[in-house]
Each structure stands twice: as C-alpha cells, then as structure tokens.
Amino acid sequence: MTTSSGRVSWFKSESSIRSIEFIVGALAVGYVFWKLQFVTTAICCGDFDGYYHIKWTQTLWEGIKSGHFPPQFPWLPLTTINSKDYVDHHLLFHIFQIPFAASPDPRLGAKIASALFGSLAVLSCYWLLLRYRVRYALVWLIALLACSAPFLFRMNMAKAPPFAIIFLVIAIHLFFQRKYWPLLPLAVVFTWTYDLFVLLILAAVFWSVSIAITEKRFEWRPLVYVIAGCVLGLIVNPYFPHNLQLLVEHMKIKLTASDFDTKVGSEWYPYDSWEFLGNSAVACIAMLVGYLGFEPSERRRGQYPIFFLLLATALMIMTARWKRIAEYWPPFAVLFAGFSLRPWLEGYRPYLTRLPAEVLEELKPFLDREGFPVPVEKPSTFRDVVQTTVVASVAVVLAVFFFFNFFATRQEIKQSESHDYYQAGAEWMRKNVPPGQLVFNTDWDDFPRLFYFDPTHYYVSGLDPGYLFDKNAELSRLYDRITLGTEEDPAPLIRDRFGARYVFSDNTHHDFFEHARNSGWFDIVYEDTQCTIMYIRDEKVEEELGVP
C-alpha cells in the first residue's frame, strides 16, 4: 500500500510532471523532424553542403584510423582552402558525425544525424523553459515548432547550426546558475565545432549587461571565461594559424554592410520585408509579446527577460540583414516571450514595484517576501475557466501556424533534387577521366555533390565563391564572366588560365553553352538531363559543338 501511494505521489509531483512533459515533447519533436527529413531521399536540403560534410567526415575518419590527422584537402587547389591552407572550421561537428558516416549507407547516416541534431536543438530550448518553470510548457513547445518555416527547414540541413543552439542554451543555463568556469571548456568546444562561436561572446556580453542593469555591478567572469575559451579554441587547433586567416576572410566577406565583391550564397543576403514577416510570423508575434510583457523592475527576476530581450533583439536585427541567422533568432524570440511572461503566468504583480516608495512602505507588512511582489490570490473557478480557455485558444492558434509551416517546409524539402542528382555524370568522370585532373565546374555550389560522388578529381570553385576570390580576385572575376556567358571564347581561358581540360556543367548555363557550341573548341563527352561534360580539344575546328 505504501509503495502504491508513493508511486501516486511521485506522479503528482512537479518533477514527475516536468519529466512527462519533456518525454512527450521529445517524442513530438522527434516525429516532426523525422517526417521532414525523410520526405526526400537526398541529404537535406536547400543546398548540397550536406554531401560535402558527410564525405569529409568519412575522409577524416579514414585519416584518423590511418594515423594521418588532419588529412589533406586537395580538391579545391585554386582557392584559399587548398591542400596547404585548408581549415576544417566544423571539426568537432564532423567528429560528431563519424558514427553516422561510418555506416554502410552514409547518405542515410547523414539524414539520421540531421534529424537527431535538429531535434536536440529544439529540445534544448524546450528544456530551458521546463528547467526554469515557465508555465504551460507544452504550449511553448508548439510555439517553438511553429516559430518559423525557415527555422524548421534549416534545422533539417546536414550542417552544424543545431550545435550552436545547443551550446548557447547550455551557456544560458550556466549564466543563470552563476557557474562561470564551465564556460571556458564550452567555448573551446563551440569554437572547434562551428565558426559562429562569436554568438557565445555576444551572449556573454548581454549577460554582463543584464547583471549591470539589475545589480549595478560589472560581472566580468562570463566575459573572461568565454573569450579565453574562444581564444584557446583558435590557438590549440590543428589548423592554427590558417584558421585565423579563414576567420578574417569570412568576416570580411560576410559582415560587410555593402554589396559583396563576389557572389555568395543567397543565405548571406537580406530578406524582403514581407518575406521576413511571412516566414517568421510566430517569432515576430513572440517578440511583440515579449516587449509588452517585459518588466525589468524586479532585480533578480528581471535578469532573465533583460538578457533575452537583448539577445533576441540582436538576433532579429541580424536575421533582417542575413538570412543565414534564420535558424537562431526564432527560438530565442519564443524564449524571450516565455521569460518575459513568466512573472505574469505565475500570478505575480510586477506593477506593484512601480508604486512610489512611501506606498510600498505602507504595503510592506502585506508582502510575503522582501523585494518580491506577492502572488495573486488563488483564482476562482470562473477565472480558472477563463485562463484555461485563453491558453487553449493560444495553443490552437499556434497549432494552425505550426501545421501551415510544417506542410510548407515539407513541400519545400520534397522539391529538393533527388539523391542521385549528378551521380551518373560524376561516375562517368570517375571512370573515364584520368584521376587527379582539374575539372572546371560552372557552378561553385555543385562542388559538394561532385566531391561526394567523384573524389578522384579536383575542382575550380566550391563551398564558397569567396575562397576563389580571396586567393585570386582576377581569376574569380574571370570565372564569373565565363560561367555567366560574357566571354565569347571561353575554352582557351579555361585551359590556359585555370589549367582544366574538362568542363562539368548543369544544363541551365545557356549563354555559356551557346558560346561553347559556336567556338569550335568543345566536344560533348557525356550528357544527360541533369548535366553536361565537355572536353576542350587540342585545336579549334570550324564546326559546332558535337559528340566526338
């Protein structure tokens, strides 16, 4: 009987309720990410970078097993990440991927890893709400899943950003617990995992500002530990000092407020205003709710919402400037709303702290704790009904947003190129082009799939066009002119300036193909519905492009 009553008591306890809420949340989040990830056979999605990451993870693992760490990267010899200067700025992310890349089907392993890492990122935010007892946690979970369609999409990409969210949540918990020394190893791990470790420095700055506002003192420890950890991660690094050079290159290209000198991925350009609002409506509403509910007058209780106000606002501004931040701002906008509303949801009267000092002195005997407003009296049955109705209504509205975003994201992922896209062309090169040849690829963002399916050849540009531009700006501009079709006789330039005899292209570079067809220099050696491979002849012939 005692055991039975003990079990009943445990299930009624706050800790058990939170545990059940977390398990339910984990199952829901895992299901959502699984359904999104496996709507396509390809490594998800938007771009082909996931193919590079999983292939390089395989290469890294083979290098570790053979005692060659880090292995050489000879695949982009004309860029700043040539074999001598290559930097793996996702090193730990690739190490985290090793158990999945070592599977018989690395494609499947990459997809499972993506679903797992994305789920953990969302769950870390949900855990923070549970840990700090923000009421109606499951409603906030729906808000996290509904906050932004680009957030759902980008969290499913086989990339490192989910770890950035996880590490930021861990850091926030350490801030709130005033446990600062673990920030140093966390910063080291963050720096080894992803080059957006600067977000951790930004978070440390905002926490110190929050302490300064509420406690009127300068809290230097989080700043020192985080900066020291980041510096240590940069220096104690197998790629030092080249990693510093690459970091400077990234900052120079990506953080400029003007137009880029060379074309970069669309993620580094700003959103259109209506696109920004439409894609992240729940996140925008969460920011508005956070601002309206923000009450900084309580000292200790005010630190959390002040911190999230600063962090979420900064991320929102960055998202408006760069689409690339779309996976960071939305969940922290929801956390900002949750922690701003926390006192109100708990029934406290923060407006009491705005009363004149003499009035507060008169009320002091009626307040239950020094420096804290008292809870509102226990609601009546009518108020319970009203409160439940409001919460249920909010949950329904959020669910509508979620289903809209979920199906829109699912449809967008479904439209991604299939896994075998470029596979036939790349395998033809692997069998018919001598190993070690440099191939002129007409799109820099085709490189990841070419690297995945045909690692026996090297390529002119890939991963980021800035790598070619920073190595040789003149050559990069020539590459753009050739691929965009403004050079009428491209073959001698490709052969003499780039050192390539084979050209790999998708079938959408119409101007380039027109000039190639009329030049008399090219033979089509392979062609399908996805790509075309051409060979530059030794001598020009007066005939149109044809199959030899």
PLM region spans:
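Start-transfer (signal-anchor) and selected internal transmembrane alpha helices
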Residues: 1-37, 383-394
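Transmembrane-helix motifs of polytopic, lipid-linked glycan transferases
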Residues: 112-133
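Membrane-interface alpha helices of multi-pass inner-membrane proteins
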Residues: 148-151, 169-174, 181-195, 200-203, ...
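Short hydrophobic/aromatic helix or loop-helix immediately within or flanking a transmembrane segment
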Residues: 77-105
